[in-house]
Amino acid sequence: MLILAKRKVEAAYAARGIPADNVKIASLDIERLGNAFTPEDRVSRIYINFCNPWSKNAGSNKHRLTHPRQLLQYRQLMDEGAEIWFKTDDDDLFRDSLSYFPAAGFEITWQTFDLHKNEPDWNLRTEHEGMFSEQGIPIKALIARKGPDSTV
């Protein structure tokens, strides 16, 4: 599945004339993120697309990929000013994420509750994005920039 995803990303980048030589697709357990990267590994952008929204029951929201607990782990790999691009169809997850990012020292620099209403030319539609959009479900999206470590 990851090979197909990488091929789709490479094709989408090629169609827009964007080099994809530095794109890495990884399927990792966030709890083991530190085991997969060295302190020298740096990330300039992370995409979180249509992740499991996890209900708020019994504290399961801490498993959300945008929960501050997870965002703090991403921060360890990110240079100051690096970005997280996040898309979801889930209203509750998006609303909660609007507070999660600042709590973890990220500044939300762009957000929308309906990505396709005024779709930016830089948006690369994912398969899930197309599927939800065809069902009339608005796609929520944001870009968050990592602030200085002193903000956490």
Residue ranges of predicted features:
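S-adenosyl-L-methionine
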Residues: 6-45
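Compact, Lys/Arg-rich rRNA/RNP-binding cores from ribosome-related proteins
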Residues: 5, 64-68, 90
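A short glycine-rich, Lys/Arg-flanked "PGG" loop and its adjoining helix->strand segment in the class I
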Residues: 62-83
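Class I S-adenosyl-L-methionine
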Residues: 94-152
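Conserved class I S-adenosyl-L-methionine
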Residues: 57-60, 83-104
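Short, well-ordered alpha-helical microsegments
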Residues: 2, 33-34, 94-95
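Conserved SAM-binding loop
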Residues: 5-6, 97
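A short SAM/SAH-binding and catalytic strip from SAM-dependent methyltransferases
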Residues: 31, 37, 43-65
